[in-house]
């Protein structure tokens, strides 16, 4: 069935209509209430006249349409207070301006100390009494404007002590000859943290804690046989565990011992590498609101996380009008990383079922036992770190925030209120039923200052098709009054793409997270896919076949395994066998066919090259509604034919469309055989 659809452009007419829309429907609603109260007979006569039903329907449409683009559909923006460059007139101009161009909320980010660079004479120093007056005024004004607000979380604070900060494993090595008694050998202390900076190995007085020491036999005259396994254990000579001798740290009788780094020992004949291993602070720092510079908090310590929250964010939320703050925003990219911390060895043993300490040299790149054992220990360490960050930091911080009636937003972490950041976050949001999915957009120099809406629209469209349905901009873009049309377009797109749930046919499982070629299963093949993790795979709910349901109630038709099953763990293999018995389609070998029709799964959408799409399914009392968002990624006008696989009575829906250069279109289909098409032309250059 072919439909040559009439295109409805979202442009100047819609913008002008929106400007007086709220006043219009409120006025009409007031008239109806007035007549119903003071002139019931007239309103009864009015209602009995069938010709008036069109008026009533129009009024209802006005009310529904005016309420359609709620705050959830509107984009947000970062609001940076840099170098203390803030004043009451500036706050008023920024907030009212951002509200007027259609922003749904702001992320307040005081960054960079005023002393670093003076932007203008009337600036205020961060955390000074005048600064708090500015903060209170911004809360008050945002509250009066009914503007949503979030606060940026920087987990650094002057109150964080070195032993409460992020930790890392450090070590020194010493080469010795065995076969004789070793007396008074100094095993130098590894690097340590002192007074805001890292000290080199051998320095004393800094923060450092020993974990264990080892004597490791090696072959050759100049160095260890394993040649350091940090690149690939598979290409290294593994060290048998019988050639690894633990050295008791505070005395002890395992072939002698070591006290304060001084070794008293006798080793068997041969060449030995002595490893002294411990942990210290990573030295990673951040400033609280641009001034309170301090160490980053240990992500494995709930007590340290609570100390951070109670010392800064809880008092902030208790300020006058502090309830206008509805979100706390965490940016994990700012952290660096840690591989040790509070109770890490104990947590590892409880979770992985064996003691990490005998295998600690693995963290120094020593391939113990075998290449496969080395990789297993490394994977277990990474998994433990992942679990601890999620449970001890994010879940603790989220619980503390919820006690203050505040939600948490962060980048690319699966179990938060609003996950953020591109494809991994899109997949995690689908798996765990989170909506909306945020992405920071156009914050670089190109996007923030040199990019016009005409240049930015193709990039925005591409990420809408990827699955992002709420953008966060830099306020350099949105402070301009001319930004309203662009923001209205984004709001309309986000309004439709936040409805229902995504239609994704394929789940791709890769033990390490991302497959090497993550574009392999996207358009133009006509299918969407999600990356699923081990947690999601093991929780796969196969309540009915042949579709599979994951924890977020997301349907998948096919499970792709991106590496040979022989390399998977026994736990994963058992789960895959269980899924096969339930009829789930599992493909674990290279697949050469152009589609999955042989499994009864036709392409969701068939499009020409250089186009992409997003598909949302809305289940209503009257049936289903399929919302398709199509984008033209070429700088030329195109006449295309799009073919849709729908759940309607039709087998396929074929639509002919005329798309302008970098144009986009919504095609909305329902099981009532209705079709609505909403298109946008290429935005003109200013």
Label each region the model flagged.
Residues 6-7, 26-29, 33, 37-40:
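Short, positively charged and aromatic/hydrophobic N-terminal segments
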Residues 48-55:
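Bacterial N-terminal signal peptides that target proteins for export
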Residues 56-63:
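Bacterial N-terminal signal peptides
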Residues 69-97, 101-105:
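Mature N-terminal segment immediately following signal peptide/propeptide cleavage
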Residues 91-92, 105, 126-157, 163-164, ...:
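Carbohydrate-binding surfaces of carbohydrate-active enzymes
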Residues 111-256, 265-266, 277, 285-286, ...:
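Acidic/aromatic-lined carbohydrate-recognition and catalytic surfaces
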Residues 232-315, 655-684:
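Extended acidic/polar, glycine-enriched regions
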């Amino acid at each position: 069935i072919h439909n040559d659809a009439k295109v409805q452009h979202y442009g100047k007419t819609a913008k002008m209509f929106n400007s007086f829309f709220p006043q219009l429907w409120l006025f009409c609603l007031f008239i109806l209430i007035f007549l119903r109260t003071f002139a019931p007979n007239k309103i009864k006569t009015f209602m009995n006249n069938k010709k008036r039903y069109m008026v009533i329907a129009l009024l209802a449409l006005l009310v529904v349409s005016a309420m359609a683009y709620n705050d959830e559909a509107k984009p947000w923006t970062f609001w940076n207070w840099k170098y203390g460059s803030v004043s009451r007139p500036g706050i008023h101009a920024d907030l009212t301006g951002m509200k007027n161009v259609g922003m749904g909320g702001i992320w307040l980010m005081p960054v960079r100390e005023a002393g670093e660079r003076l932007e203008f004479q009337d600036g205020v120093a961060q955390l000074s009494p005048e600064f708090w007056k500015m903060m209170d005024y911004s809360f008050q004004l945002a509250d009066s404007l009914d503007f949503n607000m979030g606060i940026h979380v920087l987990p650094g604070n002057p109150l964080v002590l070195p032993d409460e900060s992020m930790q890392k494993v450090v070590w020194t090595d010493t080469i010795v000859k065995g076969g004789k008694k070793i007396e008074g050998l100094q095993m130098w202390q590894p690097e340590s943290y002192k007074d805001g900076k890292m000290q080199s190995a051998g320095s004393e007085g800094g923060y450092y804690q020993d974990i264990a020491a080892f004597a490791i036999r090696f072959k050759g005259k100049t160095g260890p046989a394993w040649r350091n396994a940090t690149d690939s254990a598979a290409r290294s000579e593994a060290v048998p565990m019988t050639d690894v001798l633990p050295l008791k740290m505070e005395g002890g009788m395992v072939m002698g011992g070591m006290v304060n780094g001084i070794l008293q020992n006798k080793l068997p004949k041969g060449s030995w590498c002595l490893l002294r291993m411990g942990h210290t602070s990573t030295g990673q720092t951040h400033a609280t609101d641009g001034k309170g510079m301090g160490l980053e908090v240990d992500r494995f310590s709930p007590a340290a996380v609570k100390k951070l929250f109670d010392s800064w964010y809880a008092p902030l939320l208790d300020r006058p009008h502090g309830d206008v703050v509805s979100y706390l925003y965490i940016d994990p990219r700012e952290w660096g990383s840690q591989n040790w911390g509070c109770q890490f060895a104990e947590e590892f043993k409880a979770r992985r079922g064996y003691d990490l300490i005998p295998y600690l040299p693995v963290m120094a790149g020593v391939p113990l036992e075998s290449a496969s054992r080395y990789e297993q220990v490394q994977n277990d360490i990474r998994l433990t770190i992942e679990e601890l960050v999620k449970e001890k930091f994010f879940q603790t911080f989220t619980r503390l925030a919820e006690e203050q009636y505040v939600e948490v937003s962060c980048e690319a972490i699966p179990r938060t209120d609003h996950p953020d950041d591109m494809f991994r976050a899109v997949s995690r949001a689908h798996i765990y039923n989170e909506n909306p999915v945020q992405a920071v957009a156009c914050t670089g120099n190109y996007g923030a200052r040199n990019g016009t809406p005409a240049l930015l629209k193709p990039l925005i469209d591409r990420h809408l098709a990827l699955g992002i349905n709420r953008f966060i901009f830099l306020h350099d873009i949105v402070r301009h009054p001319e930004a309203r049309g662009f923001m209205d377009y984004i709001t309309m797109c986000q309004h439709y793409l936040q409805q229902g749930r995504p239609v994704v046919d394929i789940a791709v499982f890769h033990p390490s997270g991302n497959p090497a070629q993550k574009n392999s299963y996207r358009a133009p093949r006509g299918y969407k896919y999600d990356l699923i993790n081990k947690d999601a795979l093991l929780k796969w709910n196969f309540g009915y076949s042949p579709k599979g349901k994951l924890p977020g109630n997301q349907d998948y038709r096919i499970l792709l395994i991106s590496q040979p099953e022989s390399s998977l763990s026994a736990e994963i293999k058992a789960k895959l066998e269980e899924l096969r018995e339930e009829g789930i389609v599992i493909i674990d070998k290279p697949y050469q066919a152009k589609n999955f029709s042989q499994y009864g799964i036709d392409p969701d959408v068939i499009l020409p090259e250089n186009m992409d799409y997003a598909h949302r399914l809305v289940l209503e009392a009257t049936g289903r509604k399929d919302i398709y968002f199509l984008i033209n990624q070429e700088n030329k006008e195109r006449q295309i034919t799009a073919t849709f696989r729908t759940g309607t009575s039709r087998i396929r829906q074929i639509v002919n469309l005329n798309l302008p250069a970098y144009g986009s279109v919504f095609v909305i289909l329902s099981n009532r055989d209705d079709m609505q098409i909403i298109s946008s032309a290429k935005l003109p250059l200013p």
